[in-house]
Amino acid sequence: MVIVANKTLIRKGEGHKLVKRFDKIGKIEMQKGFLGLEVLVNAKEKEVDEVTISTRWETKADFHAWTKSEAFREAHSGRNARPDYILGNEIEFYDVEVVRMPIAQAQ
């Protein structure tokens, strides 16, 4: 499993706008190898808002296939193009080495 973290810097007070863009079903949910998505908001006091979109994929190749797909282009063009409140972003890739799940307690 691979995690792709897209850390985005946003004008102070406008982070909620990016969060809202991801608070709906999109085309990514139908992509081969897609395992899930989380939207993370950094609560530290800063001069900018920081929102990280974390996606989980079976393989890095699955993520790259998504970025080359027509669905990706549609999601990132036209009225869905990069809003002016986004100041910049950085994408990081993480290989998942250990996963631990909760153990159900006996009743």
UniProtKB/Swiss-Prot annotation:
E.C. code: 1.14.14.18
Entry-linked Pfam families: ABM
Location(s) in or outside the cell: Cytoplasm
Site (Transition state stabilizer): W66
GO biological process, one term: heme catabolic process
Entry-linked InterPro entries: ABM_dom, Dimeric_a/b-barrel, Heme-degrading_MO, IsdG
ABM domain residues: 2-93
Quaternary structure and interacting proteins, as annotated: Homodimer.
Function: Allows bacterial pathogens to use the host heme as an iron source. Catalyzes the oxidative degradation of the heme macrocyclic porphyrin ring to the biliverdin in the presence of a suitable electron donor such as ascorbate or NADPH--cytochrome P450 reductase, with subsequent release of free iron.
Protein name: Heme-degrading monooxygenase
The organism of origin for this protein: Shouchella clausii (strain KSM-K16) (Alkalihalobacillus clausii)
Taxonomic classification: Bacteria, Bacillati, Bacillota, Bacilli, Bacillales
Gene that encodes the chain: isdG
